[in-house]
Amino acid sequence: MPLPLVFLVDDDRDFLEMEAAILAAGGYRTRSFSESRAALDALAAAEGEQLPSLIVTDLMMKSLDAGFTFARAVRSDPRLRNIPIIIVSAVASQKGFDFRARTSSDLAAMNAEAFFDKPVTPAAFMAKVKELAP
C-alpha cells in the first residue's frame, strides 16, 4: 500500500521544502504547489491514490485570504470535501492579524481542521498530520 499523500500549497519555496522533508521523515508522500490554482487543477484531475489524504495550505499567497478561498473551493467539491485541511500562515507576524482558531466553529468557518502560525513547530505539526491522515 502506498504511503499517504499530502498536497502542500505555499508560495514560499523554502517552507514547501521544509514541510516536504518533515512529512517524508514521518512516512508521507508529498506534492508541492506554489499557487492554489495549480493545486485545484491537480485535485480536479486526481483519482484514487492520486487524491491526497491531507492538504496543507498557506493563508497568504497572491492575496491575503488565498488559503481561505482555496479551502472553500475544496469544500465545495463533493469529491474533495472530506479531505482534511491544515492552514499555516505568517499572517500574525507579517500583518498583525490573529486568525488562530479558538473553537471548532472558528475552524469550520475557515473550512479547515487545524490552523498553525508560522514558524510551525515540527512536532506539533506532525502530531496533527498523524491525527488527520494516519
Model-assigned labels for residue ranges:
Residues 10-11, 58, 118:
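Acidic di-acidic motifs
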Residues 13-31, 110:
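Two-component/phosphorelay signaling modules centered on CheY-like receiver
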Residues 16, 62-64:
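The feature encodes the CheY-like receiver
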Residues 32-54:
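Acidic, metal-coordinating helix/loop segments flanking the phosphotransfer/catalytic sites
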Residues 41, 66-81, 102:
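Short amphipathic alpha-helix used as the core "switch/output" element in two-component signaling
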Residues 50-53, 79-86:
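His-Asp phosphorelay/catalytic-motif detector in bacterial-type signaling
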Residues 58-59, 89:
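Active-site residues of response regulator receiver
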Residues 65-69, 91-116, 123, 127:
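Alpha4 helix (beta4-alpha4-beta5 surface) of REC/receiver domains from two-component response regulators
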